[in-house]
């Protein structure tokens, strides 16, 4: 070969290199832009809470398939940071903003503990002065109360070797006004919730234990056992005690009737004393979410953010692979002018503002964090790369966390796309992964989801919207708020990597606003209930209304006063609902609104139901 310079070849190589450099720069810019879209300061969250849930640690609970599980959450505000503890996670989370949760791996069990798998079950967490304390459900003498002044890292010390009185589902309450510490506990379908005072120095009881409250399911319909409060093979459970204080009153909260049910809820008794004379609050259950995508709102805790606004965190039920397959949800809460405790679960699995960006304004007398972004793809057409058996594609858009679509593999390139029906304004996307053929038991560290999100106006020409192909975090309920809303009709999720198992989705949910009209006001809304002077079931009411062809669903509001309709139930695609959660002897009031991808209708007139 000649050693003369081949200027034509050199020119071609220079041109090619320049072209490749431009392509590389375009790719880098595109990746950077997609990351900016996904990672700009996020103002909203969406239930279920997107944290790296552990898998069940119990082999006996995996006969229906290995799966993620937790429950019984407690959030405390300590030194202006939020600390989240829940059942069997081999650690806990902390956050500055209730959006980004940082996991701290920590085994609280001592080597000698009789519970080798439980770690912490239904934890009791409390702040006393400048220290955070943690204790787990135990009647053994080998589980200590732990303490930390710096819990953002694994820096814990034993406060006392054992809690001699023992407690399952413990709840501690330090009353700083009088410098006293109390313990409440119980999880039983036979025994009531118990209470005792603890010495603030020894953290032990003097032995005086007092029964405080018990279920009255013959009066309170929502306390009856079963998915529809109709299952008689077991008596209902009272559990999940929690205590807060407001305006000099003590609010003793409890969960019922069973953690696996959509109607799992938190009720509350109120007293002017921490250990006596508790009365059933007129508005009960105060935390209740039997409808929608993610259902259940029981065994939780109520806490204040850094602005002083109240929130409630509770257990969400999935209960497919096992009764104890569960997640966590957070909702705005508060007290009205009469000191009535409420939790606002209306649209409670749609995007909501985190505390930093919430104005604290009230809607219909309740604090609301709802963004107003609607679900754009309910029961809309779906296409997928493959399908595993009976796990059909449309299960990903049916607004039921219990059903899911699964691809045949968990490999890169599997995909699912949803058609919004028309070009719409998209603000946020939630990807709820399901556990199909998962291989993990217990906490799995250093695992992650990787994916790409594409958008299209015609379903043919696609533009990359979000690139998480390099993501290094575990995001089982991934929620992405776009920095700027986009106009599009089709959304596609392309799998890059799963932590384990198949690429499976129980909820591909696209939020924003369509460009049509909101539904008309619901017509012919009626409520039927047994006459108080005749035999019949007065703990239930049959609600009916005229089907609205423009509506995707409805939200029914209810309460015992037309001015205090604090309870809510979301109903998709039906024109009736059997409300089985009423109190026997009280008059109720109901109101309904319709919603679709465009927004929410005007509310109906209030209906009285004696």
Features from the language model and the residues they span:
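Beta-rich carbohydrate-recognition and catalytic domains
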Residues: 41-233, 245-292, 307-309, 315-360, ...
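Aromatic, loop-rich ligand-recognition surfaces of beta-strand-rich domains
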Residues: 398-466, 476-523, 534, 544-546
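Extracellular low-complexity, O-glycosylation-prone stalks/linkers
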Residues: 454-455, 550-569
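Extracellular Ig-like/FN3 beta-sandwich strand-entry sites
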Residues: 486-488, 551, 585-587
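Beta-strand-rich modules
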Residues: 579-600
